[in-house]
């Protein structure tokens, strides 16, 4: 089973690692066969699985249920689980809800925010709960941002995001996840924190790992698709097409053919 130490080692060795969202045991097993390095049980299940138009209605019980299902199906990948909207607003809530998803099978919890999370990160880490912090476009704050848009488009905004990264790493964050930021900034942050793995989704090819929503990269999302998505499924054929698509994604992350320039945001900062 891949561990947090392994992800840190991958970064040190310059070996890019793959991450996909997953919500059920059968898909988790397919990812195990494909040797996907990490799985995120994301609160994106609110839209992908439950049919909501945002992640906001998802509950901690939902996250624990899907975490347990994924863990039963996959004994290979490192597993992270989102704490959903307003489930970590207070320290007691953060501890109790993190405990619930860790007991369900998560190896790490993920929360969205910035420097203001420092105390929660410190307390969670002191209690043996590894923390990934999601920065940039944070879907739980979609109404604050006014929709799903590129973040940190100016040098000032980029520097603020870097300051937030520094604050949460100083507080104990073990992984950073950057969403929908310029490729240049993704590279800059990955280089600024040599001991902290940085995962990107729409953050350029130079982050240490890449994550996509599995349904997006399998072409199962209908309507407008984000710029940073590549459909790996349409490149496959045959009875094991899904596993082959996962394998192709894993290989493309490792050899850095994904994300290509057309999947990134090029902004002069």
Swiss-Prot record:
InterPro entries: Pantoate_hydroxy_MeTrfase (IPR003700), Pyrv/PenolPyrv_kinase-like_dom (IPR015813), Pyrv_kinase-like_dom_sf (IPR040442). Its EC number is 2.1.2.11. GO terms for biological process: pantothenate biosynthetic process. It catalyses: 3-methyl-2-oxobutanoate + (6R)-5,10-methylene-5,6,7,8-tetrahydrofolate + H2O = 2-dehydropantoate + (6S)-5,6,7,8-tetrahydrofolate. It comes from the Bacteria. 3-methyl-2-oxobutanoate binds at residues 43-44, 82, 110. The active site is at 179 (proton acceptor). Its cofactor is Mg(2+). Mg(2+) binds at residues 43, 82, 112. One of its GO terms (cellular component) is cytoplasm. Homodecamer; pentamer of dimers. Belongs to the PanB family. Catalyzes the reversible reaction in which hydroxymethyl group from 5,10-methylenetetrahydrofolate is transferred onto alpha-ketoisovalerate to form ketopantoate. This is 3-methyl-2-oxobutanoate hydroxymethyltransferase. It comes from Acinetobacter baylyi (strain ATCC 33305 / BD413 / ADP1).
